[in-house]
């Protein structure tokens, strides 16, 4: 995506071959971020298709996979009639498509990209409100009661519970160490696409409540974001 030159001396990219090692430095293009959305879709009840006008990171997974060249059958499971449902399902299906053919998602009947992806996590924020400065905190969701309770390798889907439990424990430990207090909420075995469809251990992480003031103080703290991401 092109941008205008000469706006700022700091807004530039420099390539140099000054190094203690022999070799070559080349760059056909330089990209900042994911670019702008360019997938045309019609809103419900309309025939006219248009692009969102938003950066791609603010769009859904369905549109990213479309742009990235993922097969239509992976990102569209509702015949193009329900982008909301497609977006939810595309996350797990897209992950399986990338990993299929690797040691973690072995499959001889469906094509895949063979990328060795070991885990899948859907990072969310939850709703919920307190009338004081209490923290609502972090919740984990996993799914065990589908696909014969097994993952692609034959491993029990209880591995997803272990994954979710470890994730919540680490976030709780690290944020409590930094803040002095953090709330670890429940682990739920529930039927959600993002925790059901991936054929590797997977979970949905509800990091905090986007509706609660005390949680959002943490959400807007760059160091807390780092702690959560590291955990």
Segments from the language model and where they lie:
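Active-site-adjacent mobile loop/cap segments within catalytic or ligand-binding domains
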Residues: 9, 33-35, 122-149, 178-231
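Stable alpha-helical elements in mature extracytoplasmic
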Residues: 26, 53, 57, 61, ...
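Catalytic-core regions of hydrolytic enzymes
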Residues: 39-136
